[in-house]
């Protein structure tokens, strides 16, 4: 931020001036090259004052000291006399103090002598918190600055009427800060920082004890103790777990596998053989788990190795049988098929010739014996012969009908004659 202001001082310095103290470069006691740029930025965020137009909160000691019209730009709002005092009030307080004014602690903005404040209330556990290293460096710088400035600051004279007392001076910084309940209404866990510190100390102690136990114990003892340390290894897997074992454990989360994961640093050469043996054990024990999760694949390795030879034997047994039977069938079937085809062709040709001869002879008979008109016409077409034959058939049918009628008449006449003969005999 100072670099940005120095690049464009005419345009941006006036708008950004309320966000910085006038002597912040002297306050931090460090140049741009003394610390990494990230930590310098986080320090500025830690000590960033409240924006000018934020809602005011009067101190309990001076309720009518400042009116609402007094809160304006940074020129109208009075800054504390010493920014080092303001930073020390924020940083050099016990971490057990409650931000929201709990039962055992005071308020964050009550800067009385017997009131405790929470260190986490600076940014309310913001995600951009720089960490413990930056906090320790900042506390060290603040303490050194306080030791240097405390003898130089003259005490205010008691007789002057314009100089306010000490609690009033500390209370003047209250309207410049925002009530966290207005901006961030969610409750903050009171024991977050001590719990986090205790958890990290516990993890470090566990890592030290685990390293010492792994150096003293052998591979078999560590295999028996691996089930008890599985939960602890999951907590420290970012620092102490091998890559191969992480992948195997993720794949085998459903089934408990007694595997050992020892973190061996490259300087230690005594546990290299133990680590290789453990890696071999892990690979051997986790391999069937992949097969069990894959339901389509055959379950064990031994059965899969034995089953393909059986299939090959079956195929090899069936293959020799087919070539022995098929050549005989092929050798016999072509000859039989050829002979049968030749016989069928011969029979078919003979039958076709006989049919053609019969048809020709029938046409010739029709032409010569039935159709007297076409006897001398040897080149008459079959169609003409068939037409003439049909006409002849129809004529024959007509004659048949006539003859039948005559027959009926004759039979009726015969009956009449027979009746007459019988009548005459009787008479």
Swiss-Prot record:
Residues 343-396 form the bHLH domain. Residues 222-242 have a biased composition (Acidic residues). Pfam families: HLH, Myc_N. Efficient DNA binding requires dimerization with another bHLH protein. Binds DNA as a heterodimer with MAX. This is N-myc proto-oncogene protein. Residues 210-221 have a biased composition (Low complexity). The modification Phosphoserine is found at residues 224, 226. Keywords: DNA-binding, Nucleus, Phosphoprotein, Proto-oncogene. InterPro entries: bHLH_dom, HLH_DNA-bd_sf, Myc_transcription_factors, Tscrpt_reg_Myc, Tscrpt_reg_Myc_N. It is found in: Nucleus. CDD domains: bHLHzip_N-Myc_like. PROSITE patterns: BHLH (PS50888). The gene is MYCN. It comes from the Eukaryota. Residues 45-79, 144-173, 195-255, 297-349 are annotated as: Disordered.
């Amino acid at each position: 931020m100072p670099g940005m202001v120095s690049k464009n001082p005419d345009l941006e310095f006036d708008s950004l001036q309320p966000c910085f103290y006038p002597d912040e470069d002297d306050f931090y006691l460090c140049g741009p090259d003394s610390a990494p740029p990230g930590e310098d930025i986080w320090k500025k965020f830690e000590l960033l004052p409240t924006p000018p137009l934020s809602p005011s909160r009067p101190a309990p000691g001076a309720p009518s000291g400042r009116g609402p019209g007094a809160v304006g730009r940074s020129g109208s709002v009075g800054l504390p006399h010493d920014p080092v005092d303001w930073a020390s009030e924020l940083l050099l307080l016990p971490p057990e103090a409650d931000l929201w004014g709990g039962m055992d602690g005071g308020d964050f903005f009550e800067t009385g002598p017997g009131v405790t404040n929470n260190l986490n209330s600076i940014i309310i556990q913001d995600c951009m918190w720089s960490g413990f290293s930056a906090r320790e460096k900042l506390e060290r710088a603040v303490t050194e600055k306080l030791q240097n400035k405390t003898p130089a600051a003259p005490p205010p004279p008691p007789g002057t009427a314009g100089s306010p007392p000490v609690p009033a001076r500390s209370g003047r910084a209250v309207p410049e800060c925002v009530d966290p309940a207005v901006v961030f209404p969610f409750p903050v866990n009171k024991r977050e920082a001590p719990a986090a510190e205790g958890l990290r100390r516990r993890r470090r102690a566990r890592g030290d004890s685990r390293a010492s136990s792994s150096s003293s114990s052998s591979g078999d003892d560590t295999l028996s103790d691996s089930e008890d340390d599985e939960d602890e290894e999951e907590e420290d897997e970012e620092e102490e777990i091998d890559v191969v074992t992480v992948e195997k454990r993720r794949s085998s989360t459903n089934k408990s596998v007694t595997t050992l994961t020892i973190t061996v640093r490259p300087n230690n050469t005594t546990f290299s053989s133990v680590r290789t043996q453990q890696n071999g054990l892990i690979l051997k024990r986790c391999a069937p788990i992949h097969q069990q999760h894959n339901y389509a694949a055959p379950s064990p390795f031994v059965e899969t190795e034995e089953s393909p030879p059986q299939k090959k034997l079956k195929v090899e047994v069936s293959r020799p049988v087919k070539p022995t039977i098929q050549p005989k069938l092929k050798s016999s079937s072509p000859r039989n098929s050829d002979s049968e085809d030749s016989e069928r062709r011969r029979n078919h040709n003979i039958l076709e010739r006989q049919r053609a001869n019969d048809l020709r002879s029938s046409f010739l008979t029709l032409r010569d014996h039935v159709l007297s008109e076409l006897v001398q016409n040897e080149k008459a077409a079959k169609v003409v012969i068939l037409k003439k034959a049909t006409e002849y058939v129809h004529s024959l049918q007509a004659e048949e009908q006539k003859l039948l009628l005559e027959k009926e008449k004759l039979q009726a006449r015969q009956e009449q004659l027979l009746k007459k003969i019988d009548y005459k005999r009787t008479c």
